[in-house]
Amino acid sequence: LKTRASGISGLAIEYIQEAILCFRGGAYRATAVMLGVSSEEIFLDLIRAFESKYNKKIIPEKYKPFQQIKDEFNKLFDPKKVDLPQGLKNNMEQTLNGIHDLIKKGRDDSGHPTGIEITRDEALASFSVLPLYIERVYQIIDSYSNK
């Protein structure tokens, strides 16, 4: 992952490493939670880069549910997509929202006492799309610092 996204945060890597340990131990709900937290941290990195580039404040000082932060970001991000390099615009919705939402659903199902089971295949699916998500997010972040 560090070769695909050299700027990935240490915190995101820590959660991914914990997710791997959980997966190897057959703790698939815990895997989903760790991957979800990692995905959220990665998305927050994107928001922080956006804040810096466009001099906007999206992440509040006090706690606010992540979904509210993400919704606010999306409102500001959508009109700025035109500023991105052409190659990053392709399949952006599927990458930023689709993959993030897939991983988030596993986290939400697992992180609350719903009784919903996460199968090995579901956890593996999240692991399989995570590198693409990470790579694309950090390409966007890199494009912000290169302009």
Residue ranges with predicted function:
Residues L1-K80, Q139-K147:
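Amphipathic alpha-helical interface elements
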Residues T3-G7, D71-K105:
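Short, mixed-charge amphipathic alpha-helical segments
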Residues A12, R29-A32, S39-E41, D45, ...:
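Functionally constrained cores in energy, signaling, and assembly domains
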Residues G87-K147:
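Charge-enriched, short contiguous segments at helix-coil
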